[in-house]
């Protein structure tokens, strides 16, 4: 039978009475997709009917209603405006082993939230430029054409003036912050911006993320409205405390690729630098001026495109480029950005040749070789080579060399000097046995049941299926279940991303 999400049972009046609280925390969970298996349905991208019924009921019964989104990506949040009395929403992501404790600390006020969205959350699914091209929606499960070109995520929403539900870089806090531009400088190819960040609140400590965006001039090459070039997170600031945050980016971060001559270039014009705390809450803080085109890198075409994909283009002048303007909309922002004198914004003239041009040469690929590798390669048959490339998958006795593993390369070539590589199914190590025992015959068995139904089996059967926990030869295979990439990036620490 097809897998069904465990949406949960109906919440009853009896549950409300037993809870003895005025606050309800309702968690919405979805698994990540793979192999084009996600569907645009109310049960996957949106609420299941039982979830909608439960949310409506709980919002009526409790004074405070918190919704936690335990999903690895975007989710349809239209219900926030359709169901009254929902007070707060937390994007949990998929945080791994300590995720529950982290959310509890946030809800209880032990820590102040400081994460920032790494994706733009649209009001409607069709607001995404590639919405109709995804998976089965265009009838093609085998090929995906990236027609968005450079207009991906916030670069699309900001350029095409599509109002998102939550913009890129957005995230609320229990306190309020103020950013004050302290200065901007240019040293060779490094642009440096200093920003004083102050916690204006009176109760909570908190952290803020300073974000730098640059609007590049349109020329022969079309540009997005703005691009993120740098970000930095403050320390935990106490109420009234202030910290100077220094951010840097390189002029090479402003280049664009020109396909016709395989060149990376800076086109002439004004590069407008912005500071803020999301892509929709920025102020102009400086201008970089370039008089003539600057080529920074030269490449060569080595792979001919098999077909030409018609990419999305923005034909009008970008409104966000006005040097004395800003990009601010009311997203319940908790950060005021102060520029003392908009009329005296610093400008810097970029000198020709400030970036040395680099020519890339693509010669024959260097292949590592030694007597040992030559001997191994000469011993391989055509079948051996095919098996080495394709891998052994999840079938055959070799799969059980690490019980519960997600796949192997191949264990059939160990006699020829090629070891078998056994893989876990992601950081969570799904199905992977933490402890296994090795018998005197070399057979490996997991010590603990990794499937729940096994605990109901008769003891003699379990004894045959499982390894001996008292064996002197035990193998340990632990996994961390660390947060998924979107959750790590949301922390906004550069050393994590």
Q: PLM features: residue spans?
A:
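C-terminal non-catalytic regions of proteins with extracellular/luminal or membrane-system context
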Residues: 1-417, 422-492, 496
């Amino acid at each position: 039978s097809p897998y069904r999400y465990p949406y949960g049972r109906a919440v009853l009046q009896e549950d409300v009475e037993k809870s003895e609280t005025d606050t309800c925390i309702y968690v919405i969970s979805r698994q990540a997709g793979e192999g084009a298996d996600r569907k645009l349905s109310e049960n996957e991208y949106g609420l299941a009917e039982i979830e909608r019924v439960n949310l409506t009921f709980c919002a009526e019964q409790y004074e405070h209603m918190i919704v936690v989104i335990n999903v690895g990506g975007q989710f349809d949040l239209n219900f926030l405006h359709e169901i009254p009395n929902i007070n707060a929403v937390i994007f949990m992501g998929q945080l791994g082993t300590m995720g529950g404790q982290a959310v509890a600390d946030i809800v209880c006020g032990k820590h102040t939230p400081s994460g920032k969205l790494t994706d733009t959350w649209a009001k409607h699914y069709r607001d995404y430029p590639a919405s109709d091209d995804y998976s089965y929606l265009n009838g093609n499960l085998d090929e995906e054409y990236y027609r968005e070109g450079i207009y991906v995520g916030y670069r699309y929403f900001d350029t095409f003036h599509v109002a998102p539900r939550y913009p890129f870089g957005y995230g609320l806090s229990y306190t309020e912050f103020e950013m004050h531009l302290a200065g901007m400088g240019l040293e060779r190819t490094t642009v440096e911006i200093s920003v004083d960040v102050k916690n204006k609140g009176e109760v909570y400590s908190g952290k803020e993320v300073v974000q730098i965006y640059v609007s590049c001039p349109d020329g022969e090459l079309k540009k997005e409205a703005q691009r993120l070039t740098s970000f930095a997170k403050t320390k935990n600031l106490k109420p009234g405390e202030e910290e100077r945050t220094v951010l840097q980016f390189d002029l090479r971060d402003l280049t664009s690729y020109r396909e016709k001559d395989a060149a990376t270039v800076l086109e002439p014009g004004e590069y407008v630098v912005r500071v803020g705390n999301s892509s929709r809450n920025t102020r102009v803080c400086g201008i970089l001026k370039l008089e003539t085109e600057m080529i920074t890198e030269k490449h060569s075409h080595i792979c001919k495109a098999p077909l030409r994909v018609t990419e999305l283009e923005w034909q009008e002048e970008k409104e966000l480029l006005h040097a004395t303007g800003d990009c601010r909309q009311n997203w319940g922002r908790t950060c005021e950005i102060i520029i003392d004198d908009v009329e005296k914004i610093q400008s810097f003239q970029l000198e020709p040749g400030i970036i040395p041009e680099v020519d890339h040469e693509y010669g024959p690929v260097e292949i590592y070789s030694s007597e040992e590798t030559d001997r191994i390669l000469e011993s391989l048959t055509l079948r051996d080579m095919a098996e080495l490339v394709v891998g052994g998958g999840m079938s055959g006795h070799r799969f059980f060399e690490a019980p519960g593993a997600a796949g192997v390369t191949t264990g059939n070539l160990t006699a020829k000097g090629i070891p078998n590589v056994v893989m876990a199914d992601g950081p969570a190590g799904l199905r992977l046995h933490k402890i296994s025992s090795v018998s005197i015959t070399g057979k490996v068995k997991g010590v603990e049941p990794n499937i729940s139904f096994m605990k109901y089996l008769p003891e003699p059967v379990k004894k045959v299926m499982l390894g001996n926990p008292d064996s002197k030869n035990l193998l340990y295979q632990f996994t961390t279940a660390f947060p998924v990439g979107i959750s790590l990036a949301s922390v906004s620490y550069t050393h994590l991303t």
